[in-house]
């Protein structure tokens, strides 16, 4: 696919909300051509933006649109940022019940796809909220994770995608 990535991204440099409708289509093209690290930074900025829903809500929505393998991957990133001591109280105690209280207290347990599919988007929102409180860097880790799954990111909607593309355009200007 031959196109000028820089010119496409410049359309979003002003974070113009009028670009939101076109952002869904443009995001596909950018996701194919842009370096993964740039895409991750753009997604992270969409997660942090005051113009998008709160980070935990966005993750809950992404979780609900993911397959069980993607859900497990995302949850393992979140849980790894929290630490094992907090796990039993999260998601209404569901996580503690999943592991029967027998998980290694030195490391976060690994969630399987089957276990991930037992959680609701609302429970994931609670986990994401706790993860963000314990480790604000989780927003960047989730940006990196979802940069590997750009089709899921499209589910955030045009406004969030326009923010991600705008941040990527600003990053290209700095480089």
Please tell me what each predicted stretch does.
Residues 1-175:
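A structural "flexibility-hinge" signal
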């Amino acid at each position: 696919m031959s196109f000028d990535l820089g010119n496409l991204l410049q359309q979003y440099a002003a974070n113009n909300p009028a670009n939101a409708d076109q952002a869904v289509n443009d995001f596909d093209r950018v996701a194919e051509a842009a370096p993964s690290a740039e895409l991750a930074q753009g997604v992270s900025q969409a997660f942090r933006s005051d113009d998008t829903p709160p980070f935990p809500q966005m993750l809950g929505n992404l979780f609900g649109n993911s397959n069980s393998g993607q859900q497990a991957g995302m949850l393992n990133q979140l849980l790894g940022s929290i630490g094992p001591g907090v796990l039993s109280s999260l998601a209404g105690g569901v996580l503690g019940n999943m592991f029967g209280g027998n998980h290694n207290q030195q490391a976060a347990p690994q969630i399987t796809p089957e276990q991930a599919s037992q959680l609701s988007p609302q429970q994931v929102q609670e986990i994401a909220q706790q993860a963000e409180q314990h480790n604000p860097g989780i927003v960047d880790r989730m940006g990196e994770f979802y940069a590997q799954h750009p089709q899921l990111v499209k589910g955030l909607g045009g406004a969030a995608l326009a923010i991600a593309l705008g941040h990527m355009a600003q990053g290209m200007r700095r480089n």
